């Protein structure tokens, strides 16, 4: 039985209460696995310097179980050391061990080899999956349990799973109960939470006792409807006696202020402290068309850049955290409501602004300016109307009726349009970028109004506001001058321009061993040990006119008779490839990453989807099957006997209602076939011999195993002119493959070999399909590396690690999202004077060329 008597973390209406202190908490994402160990301490100090109280940190399962049964918690995987550093920095930690984390990380942290187990239920209450999770939790949870807040550590809450309400979990209650029991069994006694990605608190928690709901809000920062949405969830959890915990949201402090006045007591903007995906760790995701590659540079515009540069939002962070510290328990215990009295706003603002009724007296009203222009508003009070100035992209926090006795001061702060960032016996301190108004009163005296000028940076304005015999000392400072609790911090910006690099040496070093193994059919990469890296395939295509490739991903380079033919990244979509009389076929398939989110529009976007060349077929025959489909009644008026039409050819005024087309396909009963619904514009349901599946316009193919296809029904919403051609392809499997696995460890091993070479200069021209190694000299210190060119992929290595990959301008390149696709980071502690590059040319309209390379200093 877990002893709760020593716990010093309490979850109540005021939020996470640490050692009895009731205060709204600001929490920054800071991920050890996206940083070299050498900078952990400095980044933690940077977060502390913004005034944030806490960090949230994922623990990626597959970062620690690097292969089945192979565990690594050393070096930059030493999460225990990171948590200890966070504690030493004075930061609380919300730990998020998954098992699934999303985070735009390879596979959402689920090990890719899980997908090799047939019928395993990922993120389900399924025994095999839970057995693997137990092995992970058996290692991760003791690390967290030993470092809980009540035991001298930093961990104040543990999040189970991540945004489960986005996923089709069959028995959420059973699944989340199993995770809860594992955590509690390892001695976790701080609050357990589960975050909802789209507001479904039961979908996220499973309705399990002992797991508190939290919410991830990602509104458009310019939306007028943030406040009423957030208040709705504040009311929902208040009915359960719980606080509104926002475990992820946008990074803008304007938006954070709007959430604060709408009832949030934990504000954890996602990725205030950006990072970098070192190694083969980015994911593929659905932020593209619909698929996309996540960049190694992991940056959503937070207040710290991936390389540690402090951005302007750090000043806004210090102001907001000073505001929450100043109001303390009164703010944490406040009740949110719709604001009254805000009117005549000259700029776009909230459709329903929020007001906090402070515990012990007073209110805080949020008045947003959702535009880039300065604005004004009027606020009605018991003292009359006050006009306030609104800075661009801001949310004024108007304090009214605040008793000052708790600060050792007389009277009441009746009104303040500047941010209250400090108060004690010496007076009150405010921050503002615009002119502001404060009003004080004491009992029996007429309220005194003071108009305050906007201060310049480094030039605070000082006032003595007097009412009768009572005086208040007031200081108004620019937000840039507001300090964190530990005092002022030196800026961490960078000076120095990018330097063009030369001094390249092309190495006489092989890019693969050439040692292959025989396989009857092309295996998936994971089956031959390539959990990260690439796989080489070769076979004969003598006498074959066309190939059909199903499920290939992520980056596929094809060659016939040693000549580059195609490069594509189609996220597993089926591809037809003409052979054109070739004799041999080669493919290099590189894993960019595994899907971090579950999206069924493309095979490679599904959680648990595997990588490699997929299934490769020769097209033995093709037949047009666009005609002779019967149209069934249902929501249409087609009668019996059913009329014959072409697929999609029914005419009806009942647009949008389902129309079902049915026919028997001319399958031979012994071969594999593929049905191609060419021109499909919307998802449709295809029932093959009674078994239904959804077919997406992004991959309009249906594979038919031998014997399937005697009865095919296609159901789609009726829309005039939305029909298309249909073709049936008869397939024969391509056999007798030679396969060379080249996992990340093999590539990194090659990158570390000594080799002679010849000096070369930029621009470097390559042939399509050609690849080689080059060494490039780099100036000392941390560096941002950039590459110029076209139709070239670059993998950069240093310090025994892959720094990252860049794909220069190329029509075959997919969309990159999540950060800067052209930047790689060489940390200063890893810089020994150079980097090793593996460069590969891709086929396209022109000749591949790496035109140049630059290195800019980073603030290490």
Model-inferred region functions:
Residues 133-142, 151-154, 159, 172-173, ...:
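Carbohydrate-binding surfaces of carbohydrate-active enzymes
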Residues 545-560, 585, 665-690, 712-716, ...:
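Aromatic-lined ligand-binding clefts that engage carbohydrates, nucleic acids, or primary amines
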Residues 40-106, 180, 184:
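Aromatic-lined substrate-binding rim segments of carbohydrate-active enzymes
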Residues 19, 443, 558-565, 687-693, ...:
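Short strand-turn-strand beta-turns centered on an Asx-Gly dipeptide
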Residues 4, 95, 100-132, 138-267:
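Substrate-binding/catalytic cleft of secreted carbohydrate-active enzymes
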Residues 1-54:
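N-terminal carbohydrate-binding accessory modules
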Residues 21, 58-63, 67-70, 75, ...:
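Aromatic- and acidic-residue-enriched carbohydrate-binding clefts of CAZyme catalytic domains
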Residues 32-49, 68-85, 174-175, 551, ...:
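Aromatic- and glycine-enriched glycan-recognition loops and surfaces
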């Amino acid at each position: 039985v877990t002893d709760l008597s020593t716990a010093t973390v309490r979850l109540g209406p005021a939020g996470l209460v640490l050692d009895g202190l009731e205060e709204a908490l600001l929490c920054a994402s800071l991920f050890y696995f996206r940083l070299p160990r050498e900078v952990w301490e400095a980044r933690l100090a940077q977060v502390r310097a913004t005034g944030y109280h806490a960090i949230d940190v994922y623990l990626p399962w597959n970062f620690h179980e690097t292969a089945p049964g192979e565990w690594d918690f050393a070096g930059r995987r030493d999460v225990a050391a990171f948590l200890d550093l966070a504690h030493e920095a004075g930061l609380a930690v919300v730990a998020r061990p998954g098992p699934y984390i999303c985070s735009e990380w390879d596979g959402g942290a689920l090990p890719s080899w899980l997908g090799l187990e047939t019928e395993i239920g990922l993120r389900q209450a399924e025994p095999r999956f839970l057995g693997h999770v137990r092995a992970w939790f058996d290692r991760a949870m003791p690390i967290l349990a030993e470092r809980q807040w009540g035991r001298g550590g930093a961990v104040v809450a543990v999040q189970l799973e991540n945004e489960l309400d986005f996923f089709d979990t069959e028995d959420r209650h059973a699944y989340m109960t199993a995770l809860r029991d594992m955590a509690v069994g390892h001695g976790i006694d701080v609050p357990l939470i589960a975050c909802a990605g789209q507001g479904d608190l039961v979908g996220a928690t499973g309705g399990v006792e002992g797991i508190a709901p939290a919410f991830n809000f990602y509104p458009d920062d310019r939306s007028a409807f943030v406040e009423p949405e957030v208040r709705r969830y504040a009311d929902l959890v208040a009915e359960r006696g719980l606080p509104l915990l926002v475990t992820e949201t946008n990074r803008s402090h304007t938006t954070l202020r709007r959430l604060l006045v709408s009832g949030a007591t934990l504000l954890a903007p996602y990725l205030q402290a950006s990072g970098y995906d070192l190694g083969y760790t980015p994911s593929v995701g659905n932020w593209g068309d619909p698929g996309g590659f996540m960049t190694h540079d992991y940056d959503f515009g937070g207040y710290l850049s991936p390389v540690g540069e402090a951005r302007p939002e750090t000043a806004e962070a210090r102001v907001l955290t000073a505001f929450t510290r100043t109001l303390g328990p009164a703010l944490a215990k406040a009740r949110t409501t719709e604001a009254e009295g805000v009117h005549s706003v000259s700029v776009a603002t909230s459709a329903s602004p929020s007001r906090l009724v402070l515990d012990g007296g007073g209110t805080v009203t949020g008045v947003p300016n959702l535009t880039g222009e300065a604005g004004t508003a009027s606020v009605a009070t018991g003292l009359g109307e006050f006009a306030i100035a609104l800075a661009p992209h801001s949310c004024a926090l108007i304090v009214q009726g605040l008793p000052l006795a708790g600060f050792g001061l007389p009277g009441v702060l009746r009104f303040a349009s500047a941010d209250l960032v400090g108060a004690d016996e010496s007076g009150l301190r405010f921050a503002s970028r615009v002119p502001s108004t404060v009003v004080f009163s004491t009992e029996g005296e007429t309220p005194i109004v003071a108009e305050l000028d906007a201060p310049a940076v480094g030039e605070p304005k000082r006032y003595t506001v007097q009412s009768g015999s009572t005086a208040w000392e007031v200081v108004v400072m620019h937000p840039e001058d507001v300090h964190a609790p530990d005092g002022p911090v030196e800026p961490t910006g960078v000076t120095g321009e990018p330097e063009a690099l030369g001094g390249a040496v092309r190495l006489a070093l092989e890019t693969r061993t050439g040692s292959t193994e025989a396989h009857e059919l092309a295996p998936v990469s994971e089956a031959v040990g390539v959990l990260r890296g690439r796989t080489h395939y070769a076979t004969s295509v003598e006498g074959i006119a066309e190939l059909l490739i199903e499920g290939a991903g992520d980056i596929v380079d094809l060659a016939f008779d040693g000549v580059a033919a195609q490069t594509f990244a189609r996220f597993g979509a089926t591809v037809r490839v003409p052979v054109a009389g070739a004799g041999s076929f080669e493919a290099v398939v590189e894993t960019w990453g595994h899907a971090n989110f579950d999206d069924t529009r493309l095979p490679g976007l599904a959680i648990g989807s595997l990588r490699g060349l997929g299934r490769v077929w020769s097209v033995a025959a093709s037949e047009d099957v666009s005609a002779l489909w019967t149209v069934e009644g249902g929501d249409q008026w087609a009668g019996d006997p059913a009329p014959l039409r072409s697929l999609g050819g029914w005419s009806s005024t009942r647009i949008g209602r389902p129309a079902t087309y049915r026919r028997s396909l001319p399958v031979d009963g012994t071969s594999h076939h593929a049905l191609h619904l060419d021109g499909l514009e919307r998802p449709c349901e295809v029932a093959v011999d009674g078994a239904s599946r959804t077919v997406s316009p992004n991959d309009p193919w249906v594979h038919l195993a031998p014997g399937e296809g005697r009865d095919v029904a296609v159901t789609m919403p009726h829309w005039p002119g939305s029909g298309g051609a249909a073709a049936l392809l008869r397939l024969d499997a391509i056999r007798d493959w030679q396969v060379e696995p080249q996992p990340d460890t093999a590539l990194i091993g090659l990158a570390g070999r000594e080799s002679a070479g010849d000096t070369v200069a930029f621009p470097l021209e390559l042939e399509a399909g050609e690849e080689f190694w080059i060494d490039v000299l780099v100036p000392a210190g941390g560096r941002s590396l950039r590459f110029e060119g076209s139709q070239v992929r670059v993998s950069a290595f240093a310090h025994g690690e892959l720094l990252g990959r860049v794909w220069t301008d190329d029509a075959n390149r997919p969309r990159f999202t999540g950060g800067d696709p052209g930047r790689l980071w060489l940390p200063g502690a890893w810089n020994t004077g150079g980097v090793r590059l593996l460069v590969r040319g891709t086929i396209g309209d022109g000749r591949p060329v790496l035109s140049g390379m630059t290195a800019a200093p980073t603030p290490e």
